[in-house]
Amino acid sequence: MSYGREDTTIEPDFIEPDAPLAASGGVADNIGGTMQNSGSRGTLDETVLQTLKRDVVEINSRLKQVVYPHFPSFFSPSDDGIGAADNDISANCDLWAPLAFIILYSLFVSHARSLFSSLFVSSWFILLVMALHLRLTKPHQRVSLISYISISGYCLFPQVLNALVSQILLPLAYHIGKQNRWIVRVLSLVKLVVMALCLMWSVAAVSWVTKSKTIIEIYPLALCLFGMAWLSTIL
């Protein structure tokens, strides 16, 4: 039994004449260039050291916006500067720096004891309370709750310095001169002065960047920050 030739012939796929092979090469080149450009902007091909360095630089730049320059201008802030800084900060919020500050604060105050977990949870709770207060007292501002948590977390940087001085540096000086009663009194006075300065710094920063000007807006924030400052002083 024989079959016709057309029964065993497989026709080739039809290729449109207006789709030249060179076009496919151009598309491939474009795709490759796009992938190369996106890969150069990614973080998968960089080392851990480069990633940490980039994160530290970004945290430092946000500290300049939130904390560094605003302490002298607390009593006479500029509305234009506040608006520009607020828009930039609320648009680029992160929780890496607040997490790092809370970990450092808890380590300094607890001395890596079992108190660390309580301080860690309490610090996040304080940040949440501050963020909720800002969100409720400023309903007209288009700032999310996460942004307020991030801003409040950056304002904990002076409290980290307070914990470092009160719990690490001053105790070392105390052990060196503990035989002299005057040195002990001076160190206690220095601890209170450092606590007051860092508390004013934190309150000034969070008030400036969130445009909080009335007592109703500032007092709860100052009370939360005072609790953290007092814990790092007495523990």
Curated annotation (Swiss-Prot):
Gene that encodes the chain: YIP4
Role description: May be involved in proper membrane localization of Rab GTPases.
Subunit comment: Interacts with TVP18, TVP23, YIP1 and YIP5. Interacts with SEC4, YPT1, YPT6, YPT7, YPT10, YPT11, YPT31, YPT32 and YPT52; These proteins are all Rab GTPases.
Keyword tags: Golgi apparatus, Membrane, Transmembrane, Transmembrane helix
InterPro entries referenced in this protein's UniProt entry, alphabetically: Yip1/4-like
Molecular function, one GO term: small GTPase binding
The family this protein is said to belong to: Belongs to the YIP1 family.
Residues annotated as transmembrane: 89-109, 114-134, 145-165, 186-206, 215-235
PANTHER family, sorted: GOLGI MEMBRANE PROTEIN YIP1, PROTEIN YIPF6
Annotated compartments: Golgi apparatus membrane
Top-rank taxon: Eukaryota
Name the UniProt record assigns to this protein: Protein YIP4
Bilayer topology term: Multi-pass membrane protein
GO CC annotations, alphabetized: Golgi apparatus; Golgi membrane; trans-Golgi network
Source organism of this protein record: Saccharomyces cerevisiae (strain ATCC 204508 / S288c)
BP term (GO), one: endoplasmic reticulum to Golgi vesicle-mediated transport
